[in-house]
Amino acid sequence: MGDIRLAPRFVMGFLVAATLVGLVACASDRDPPPAEPSFYNSLASAEAKVDAGMAASMISGYRTNNGLSSVQVDPELTKLAQAQAQAMAARDKIEHNVLRDFNVRMRSSGFDAKLAAENIGAGYHTLAQAFSGWRDSPPHRKNMLLPGATHIGIATAYAPQSKYKVFWALILAAPDRPRG
């Protein structure tokens, strides 16, 4: 009779152990947590690159919430923004005319714009920080909400020797003629 009493306890113990092993196995099979959104990625390194598509999406959302058109990334504007960001980083200066006047740069860019505006900045280490800084600054907000803008170029440049580390340039524009 003593053996019969041990059997249910043994079976119960075995079932509890098997259940625990199964739960542990299930827990380890879970998908890894999702990656952090790219707008939180630090751009304070030489190999980091701003996610232009994410920037266009954020700016488009902001614009459409304010009754304006969305924007798309343009390669010519991106090249122009990259040159501006790199020039500011090389000189450790935050200014629109570090290369040449913005209007002169636009005319020589290959992007025939009927309207354009430029936001620059430094010290923001993520796209989220730059976007928030521009949104909270009246002149920069006005540029992000430029009526008629349909294209953007955005770029960063890393300057490890600078107190700012990351320099930004954002260009919003509308082409004079539809772009293909």
Tell where the protein language model's regions lie, with residue ranges.
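Disulfide-stabilized extracellular recognition modules
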Residues: G2, L127-G180
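Bacterial N-terminal signal peptides that target proteins for export
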Residues: G2-F14
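C-terminal motif of bacterial Sec signal peptides marking the signal peptidase cleavage site
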Residues: V21-A25
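Bacterial signal peptide processing site
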Residues: A27-R30
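Short, surface-exposed glycine/acidic/tryptophan-bearing loops
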Residues: P34, T78-H125
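A short alpha-helix/helix-coil micro-patch that ends at or immediately precedes a cysteine
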Residues: P34-A89
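Solvent-exposed, polar/charged alpha-helical surfaces in well-ordered, non-transmembrane soluble domains
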Residues: G53-G61, P75-Q86, V104, E118, ...
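Surface-exposed patches in mature extracellular/periplasmic domains of secreted proteins
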Residues: N65-K79, D92-F102, A117, R141-T156
